[in-house]
A protein has these predicted regions:
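Alpha-helical transmembrane segments in eukaryotic/viral proteins
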Residues: 16-47
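Glycan-processing catalytic domains of CAZymes
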Residues: 14-16, 47-340
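Extracellular Ser/Thr-rich, low-complexity/disordered mucin-like segments
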Residues: 6-9, 42-50
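Intrinsically disordered, low-complexity terminal tails of fungal membrane proteins
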Residues: 1-16
């Protein structure tokens, strides 16, 4: 006697709809996870990730101005420079690096009228409680306090809120007429940041900053962060380096010179102490200048010797000592950066 197989029960419409909905949810979750990972530009939860050192593609935008190797410069962040009606500046240099927030547009206009170019400094990788946009940062954006800098904290570089803040800062630079920007503290991965930032996070962040800056026709620099140079060199137009002689790392930054891009190099021979009056008047000794101006790997750098306060005092490698007047009634929050 044969037995007929039991026929399979046909799927009800309800079961089909439930299964289809489940599949759709899984696909959506995967898509959101992938998209979020791409947007954040890297993981924030592994300090030991190896940086992606494959050079990023060069931007297609051609800029009106980029600095040249050997360009002379002055950096004044303690207060805005006081620009008089004289036909030149003190010192008579090509570029001034000034604080974005503290420097009025009128000062930048005056520098332009004297034939100078202006690079505007801001901290891209930290929260500073005294800045006018400090209220825009969210608690989740913030990490540990920078060692030695009360009121300043590392930030999560992949945060969309943080990136929006930096976009507005770059737009402020354009509105003020800055020719370039000097975004600082992009090397949080080298410090105890409390956010598990990696080199890949910094690389992705620099790519984002470039995508905002270049369409606004401004050049952009890399501040320190020597270990990511090979990846981001195509994105940036210059380096601003602090203390590569002191830390024996100038050879890393020589890659900029090899690529035809300048290195604006700062050394602080007196450390964080006050300069003696004789040094302020006459400059450092010849031996000190030789040490900080002719170090291994620094050939072609545009070197200045400065106080840690980054006020108007500067000495050049030829022994010239110059003092830029400052507007002490304006600003006063800019300060030097070298977090170790």
């Amino acid at each position: 006697m044969s037995t007929k197989p039991t026929p399979k029960r046909p799927w009800s419409l309800r079961r089909k709809l439930l299964l289809g909905g489940l599949i759709a949810l899984i696909v959506l979750a995967l898509a959101l996870g992938l998209g979020l990972g791409l947007t954040l530009g890297g993981s924030d939860d592994n300090d030991n990730d190896s940086p992606t050192l494959t050079p990023l593609p060069s931007p297609n935008t051609t800029l009106t101005w980029t600095p040249k190797v050997g360009d002379s410069w002055q950096i004044v962040l303690s207060h805005p420079p006081a620009i008089s009606s004289t036909p030149s500046t003190t010192p008579n240099v090509t570029i001034f690096d000034v604080d974005l927030f503290d420097t009025p547009k009128a000062t930048i206009d005056s520098l332009h009228a004297l034939g100078r170019k202006v690079i505007c400094y801001f901290s891209a990788g930290s929260y500073e409680e005294w800045r006018t946009d400090a209220q825009d940062f969210k608690p989740d954006d913030l990490g540990k306090e920078l060692d030695g800098w009360p009121g300043e904290k590392w930030v999560r570089l992949g945060s969309q809120n943080l990136r929006g803040i930096m976009k507005r800062r770059i737009e402020m630079a354009r509105e003020k007429g800055c020719d370039g920007v000097d975004p600082d503290n992009v090397d949080g991965y080298q410090n105890d940041n409390g956010l598990s930032l990696t080199a890949n996070d910094s690389i992705a962040f620099m790519q984002y900053l470039s995508s905002v800056t270049r369409p606004l026709n401004m050049s952009m620099g890399l501040k320190n962060a020597g270990s990511i140079i090979s990846a981001v060199l195509p994105l940036v137009d210059f380096s601003v380096n602090e203390q590569c002689i002191q830390y024996n790392e100038c050879s890393k930054f020589a890659a900029f010179i090899d690529a035809g891009k300048p290195v604006f190099h700062i050394e602080y021979p007196a450390g964080d102490g006050d300069l003696q009056q004789s040094v302020e008047s006459n400059g450092f000794s010849e031996d000190t200048r030789k040490k900080f101006c002719n170090g291994e790997g620094s050939k072609g750098f545009s070197t200045v010797l400065k106080k840690m306060s980054l006020d108007g005092w500067v000495e050049y490698c030829d022994g010239r000592v110059e003092v830029t007047g400052i507007d002490s009634g304006t600003g006063g929050h800019g300060k030097p950066r070298k977090v170790r």
